[in-house]
Amino acid sequence: MKKLNNEDIQAYFQAGNSGFWKVESEEGKKTRLYTDEITNELFGIPEDMSPEKCMEYVAEHIYPQERECFWDYMEELKSHESEAVYRYMHPVKGVIYIRCTGRRIPSSDNMIRLVGYHQEAGDIVHFEKENLLENQLLQQNQQL
């Protein structure tokens, strides 16, 4: 089988509305978030934003009741691969669901580097809610 080229890989992630990100943090400096075009579009991030401002922007747009969980998730990534789904307040679309998967990558310096991808998760959340509802209805019908 032939290997996928970079264009194939990019097309795959565009089709899945999945964007890449990298977070860098080190003592005494602001945390930096680096994003690709898909992630910028997914989060409504202006193109000319610095990595430091980008991290602040995304954190401010996470649904208020889920910010603490988001920061817990970021801490979790420092020790092992993990995934989270959270609500995000997009400046144009309104509230959307985001699925985030990431992990820490090795570093020879004291910097913490996390990498991963974001994906809009509205369809996944909708499917799971429907599944729960169907199971509840099935249980109710079995009790009749």
Identify the role of each PLM range:
Residues 25, 105, 121:
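Hydrophobic pocket-lining residues within nucleotide cofactor-binding pockets
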